[in-house]
Amino acid sequence: YRVNVKSLVWYSPDNFEDNGYEIPETMEDLLALADQMVSDGNTPFCIGLGSGGATGWPATDWMEDIMLRTHSPMTYDQWVSNDMKFNDQRVIDAMEFFGSIALNDSYVNGGTKAVATTDFRDSPNGLFTSPAECMMHRQASFIPAFFPEGSEAGVDYDFFYFPPFEAQDLGKPVLGAGTLMAPTNDRKITTEFMKFLLHTEANERFMEKGGFLTPHKYVDIDKYSSETFKGCLLYTSDAADDTTG
């Protein structure tokens, strides 16, 4: 019913323009940009893992994206199926790379102590403060639903692709997710509601609100709230053949 593109980094176009920052094309460029931001007195990232009983899940997305950028889809699948154990050195290397960002006080808004305690819904707010508390926020396509009210896509915020390592030859993998629904009873109202969700109208209503991507083939893509969200959708179709979700 719903899809999310996770390999995205959100930023403020004005903040980038004011500081002379360019969109990084590789992971090496991203890290160099982060170092430049620190040198300029800015904080590169807002990271929040808080989510009540599910606290920590945003870190799993970081880990998956890193694994896809350092190893083949086959290796990734072995990890997912547990054929490759979680203490495998390749997994540990990915974890340590994430740690080099999340556990770097200079890189993270509020310092590393704030990472686990900041709610993931509040974490991107630092993009919109004046002065900005952070320059970038890696999160999925749903996150604009939690941006400050009145924020305009393509003006107040935009995104770029979480880039691959230049040193690797793994294409441009895209991490994704989908929402599945299943009835828990056989009442007619339940069945009819699920049928309604299959209609283009139901999807287009959510598309107009922003923060929603649909896999429905027959929707009017002009119903998306902005060109920004159309751009998110393109990543689901233009991703390399080795895309994993």
Whereabouts are the PLM-identified features?
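A local structural motif
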Residues: 19-22, 102-119, 133, 152-156
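Short helix-initiation/N-cap motifs at beta->coil->alpha
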Residues: 27-29, 112-126
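Extracytoplasmic/periplasmic substrate-recognition and gating elements
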Residues: 18-19, 142, 148-214
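Glycine-centered hinge/linker elements that transmit conformational signals in sensory
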Residues: 34-36, 80-116, 162
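Short helices/loops that flank or line small-molecule/ion binding pockets
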Residues: 15-16, 34-40, 119-137
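Conserved small/polar residues in nucleotide/adenosyl-binding loops
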Residues: 235-243
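Short, solvent-exposed loop/beta-turn-alpha elements that line the ligand-binding surface or hinge
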Residues: 68-93, 149-151, 164-173
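Periplasmic solute-binding protein
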Residues: 1-23, 28-31, 42, 48-79, ...
